Amino acid sequence: MALSTRIQAACLLLLLLASLSSGAYLRQQTRQTTALQPWHGAESKTDDSALLMLKRRKRDTNFPICLFCCKCCKNSSCGLCCIT
């Protein structure tokens, strides 16, 4: 029983050490990545503006801008009304 408790304690200690070392390694990698990419902040600003453009409402297609051709212009095959 004492041997299994020691093994469990050793495994727990190894897990704690591994999690601490991986956390420190990830923080170091994050700092290096940030230092290598100073333009990242500008890129995120353009991404934000692109998201705003996507969120804009589109024109309601039930109300067309142009009407069908009423033959008001010389080009009768245009299909659109040039008055509107």
Swiss-Prot record:
GO BP terms, alphabetized: acute-phase response; antimicrobial humoral immune response mediated by antimicrobial peptide; cell surface receptor signaling pathway via JAK-STAT; cellular response to bile acid; cellular response to interleukin-6; cellular response to lipopolysaccharide; cellular response to tumor necrosis factor; cellular response to X-ray
Cellular component GO terms, alphabetical: apical cortex; extracellular region; extracellular space; intercalated disc; nucleus
Name of the protein described by the UniProt record: Hepcidin
Xref: InterPro entries: Hepcidin
Coarse class of the protein's main subcellular location: secreted
Single GO MF descriptor: hormone activity
Keyword Hydrolase: no
